[in-house]
Amino acid sequence: MAGGSFGPTGVAKERAEQYQGKVTSYVIIACLVAAIGGSIFGYDIGISGGVTSMDEFLEEFFHTVYEKKKQAHESNYCKYDNQGLAAFTSSLYLAGLVSTLVASPITRNYGRRASIVCGGISFLIGSGLNAGAVNLAMLLAGRIMLGVGIGFGNQAVPLYLSEVAPTHLRGGLNMMFQLATTIGIFTANMVNYGTQQLKPWGWRLSLGLAAFPALLMTLGGYFLPETPNSLVERGLTERGRRVLVKLRGTENVNAELQDMVDASELANSIKHPFRNILQKRHRPQLVMAICMPMFQILTGINSILFYAPVLFQTMGFGGNASLYSSALTGAVLVLSTFISIGLVDRLGRRALLITGGIQMIICQVIVAVILGVKFGDNQELSKGYSVIVVIFICLFVVAFGWSWGPLGWTIPSEIFPLETRSAGQSITVAVNLLFTFIIAQAFLGLLCAFKFGIFLFFAGWVTVMTIFVYFLLPETKGVPIEEMTLLWSKHWFWKKVLPDATNLEDESKNVSV
């Protein structure tokens, strides 16, 4: 095996240039199948907003909201302010938050495929319950099962993509999860646009169609190859080598395999990964695992994607026009993700996050000004201003789609060493789902209270996160996943936080006892 110098964590420092291989059809197919999990996540994000704007659904389960919607004197910003309706959307993410804690040990001890299959089965059950719901309890039970699927899928799929992708294309291939998510959102918007014509049962079709990608995810999980990292970590080194040879299209995988073996030896010495991740030497990665998903949600994007039809109806768009406008934003999100895939491994992560953040701030401020000046509680926007609002919301979505959308998942999935990778991904998913739940539950109330100021609220957060990236996030482009820890010791701020190299070995031993 190829040699290399070692740091205190036991992982090779200078072996990356010896990695060989190419992008094989085996890698592409594996990534495509795995990324189906993202499409279901996106479908469930996009479908709820359209369904909750359908009169038949509201009359069946949320009659109070249905009556309020029909009252002309009700404030435009407060028509949909109902905690029960918000709970329909947010329950999905609360269930996902709990299930991701269960998914972490399964992903580590039984492999990434096991969690992908568990997620697919949960999605199947949830979509069936939602489609056949006859009361609110059955409806919420279906949403909870979908949330369990999200917890498993979002925990395993980004890890899977990071671990099968070649180092030089890891950013682009890992973004297939976000691309699949955006395709799922767009598909949900188009489905809602069609099913709202099918009265009174169109909403059932919207909710039930999630079963199709769930079936693909479940079946695909059985046939996917396990990642070589996971196999090596579980002691199946020779099997891991065979998979790595297929993935890289070359027999000369010694250098990359040796990095995995070195990392797995350290990983297997760690008995309590969640305790280990709290060590000072993992502080930079832990901060990123918390801040990146938190900031991703605080861009305000999920509020637009969850409630796009509701939001556009609030602005005076008719039922069909609001669904059409939300479908347009979904299409724009898909296209912008393609831009990110093409640029992320050339321009790097930091450039996309900073420029995307600036663009989002400008768009949100402009939308807030237009709504504040031209849109009142009981008025409607003129056609011209409505078009301008839709354009700037689309530009906001474009900025998110090539920056925080994919990179909010990519960066946390690639920065952790193997011994804390599964725990780190669990924290990332848990934080994402926690803040998604909070925003989903609070958004309709915030919209009623802040009115047009809701866009300024999110613009303020985007300003904070852009400054955070500029000062605290090092560039991870082209850095091998098993050598990522070296970045932090060279960063102007994090090198002050990390313990001395001589203390790292002792710290590692202490946590494994």
From Swiss-Prot:
InterPro entries: MFS_dom, MFS_STP/MST-like_plant, MFS_sugar_transport-like, MFS_trans_sf, STP/PLT_plant, Sugar/inositol_transpt, Sugar_transporter_CS
Keyword set includes Cell inner membrane: no
SUPFAM superfamilies membership: MFS general substrate transporter
Keyword Transmembrane: yes
Domain of life: Eukaryota
Membrane topology recorded in Swiss-Prot or TrEMBL: Multi-pass membrane protein
Gene3D superfamilies, alphabetized: MFS general substrate transporter like domains
GO cellular component, one term: pollen tube
Cytoplasmic side of membrane: 1-26, 473-513
Membrane-traversing stretches: 27-47, 84-104, 121-141, 144-164, 171-191, 205-225, 286-306, 324-344, 351-371, 387-407, 427-447, 452-472
Pfam families per UniProt: Sugar_tr
GO molecular function terms listed in the Swiss-Prot or TrEMBL record: arabinose transmembrane transporter activity; symporter activity
Main subcellular location: membrane
Family classification: Belongs to the major facilitator superfamily. Sugar transporter (TC 2.A.1.1) family.
Cited function: Mediates an active uptake of hexoses, probably by sugar/hydrogen symport.
Protein name in UniProt: Sugar transport protein 7
Organism: Arabidopsis thaliana (Mouse-ear cress)
